[in-house]
Swiss-Prot record:
This is ADP-L-glycero-D-manno-heptose-6-epimerase. The lineage of its organism: Bacteria, Pseudomonadati, Pseudomonadota, Gammaproteobacteria, Enterobacterales. GO terms for biological process: ADP-L-glycero-beta-D-manno-heptose biosynthetic process; carbohydrate metabolic process. Substrate binds at N169, S180, H187, F201, E202, G203, S204, R209, Y272. The gene is hldD. Transmembrane segments: none annotated.
Length: 310
């Protein structure tokens, strides 16, 4: 069996899909379906069982067994960069992850988990997986950073695989439940389908992020599991592209040209990553050599998926 926490969420459900594509269906999805919209991410997928995340944690802490577990993909977390309840964030992202990590270590179960580029904070260069480059801007980034630091202490002595992925700006299918936290591509598509003029912040040609397609993210997760490599790795494309480029790709798909530029919100100033670009040196050195989709390629594929029933 393979366990995917956050398996009804954005990246988790895409990992489930990639496992299904390899013929793997003996999957336990762990999540919190209090948000009644997330289930749609699983409707077209095949899994063996589902468990609520609180019930799962109780069983993990009690040392209960789940049969022969081949791997744990730990994607479950509060990923809102605007959530400022520090206790909730640390319980949900840090303590939970520690419990699950130790459960896996005691049983030699490969543990692959979601870290984040938010660990780098407001940097504009040198996004490198090393302590001197890490300075998160929000409690979400701090919770991810602290768990990475915890893993770094354990890695030298670990007898089983531990690998963390610092996700950059992930976009693509199965993110609709995220609402305001969904990608710019998702929101642009919604606006265009509603007959609205799509909106970007002023200066969007200067805001550049490493936008990585979720299908590529799932591919990297599965490659590392299949190859048993441990460590903490950036997971982006290695290219910074502008929000304007995302809009251009969405407009091209919809055969539109008009854009409206809106003022940048005061509340986000100083807490907003204006530039991200993954340094892929360590990822490539680990042996992962597949190319990543460009914004033009990924957004076009995503638009086709979003509008598949249109």
């Amino acid at each position: 069996m393979i366990i995917v926490t956050g398996g009804a969420g954005f990246i988790g459900s895409n990992i489930v899909k990639s496992l299904n594509d390899k013929g793997i269906t003996d999957i336990l999805v762990v999540d919190n379906l209090k948000d009644g919209t997330k289930f749609v991410n699983l409707v077209d997928l095949n899994i063996a069982d589902y468990m609520d995340k609180e019930d799962f944690l109780i069983q993990i802490m009690a040392g209960e067994e789940f049969g022969d577990i081949e791997a744990v993909f730990h994607e479950g977390a509060c990923s809102s960069t605007t959530e400022w309840d520090g206790k909730y964030m640390m319980d949900n992202n840090y303590q939970y992850s520690k419990e699950l990590l130790h459960y896996c270590l005691e049983r030699d179960i490969p543990f692959l988990y979601a870290s984040s580029a938010a660990t780098y904070g407001g940097r504009t260069s040198d996004f490198i997986e090393s302590r001197e480059y890490e300075k998160p801007l929000n409690v979400y980034g701090y919770s991810k950073f602290l768990f990475d630091e915890y893993v770094r202490q354990i890695l030298p002595e670990a007898s089983s695989q531990i690998v963390g992925f610092r996700y950059f700006n992930v976009y693509g299918p199965r993110e609709g439940h995220k609402g305001s936290m969904a990608s710019v591509a998702f929101h642009l598509n919604t606006q265009l389908n509603n007959g609205e003029t799509p909106k970007l912040f002023e200066g969007s040609e200067n805001f550049k992020r490493d936008f990585v397609y979720v299908g590529d993210v799932a591919d990297v997760n599965l490659w590392f599991w299949e190859n048993g490599v441990s460590g903490i790795f950036n997971l982006g494309t290695g290219r910074a592209e502008s929000f304007q480029a995302v809009a251009d790709a969405a407009l091209a798909y919809h055969k539109k040209s008009d854009l409206e530029y809106i003022p940048f919100p005061e509340k986000l100033k100083g807490r907003y990553q204006a530039f991200t670009q993954a340094d892929l040196t360590n990822l490539r050195a680990a042996g992962y050599d597949k190319p990543f989709k460009t914004v033009a390629e990924g957004v076009t594929e995503y638009m086709a998926w979003l509008n598949r029933d249109a």
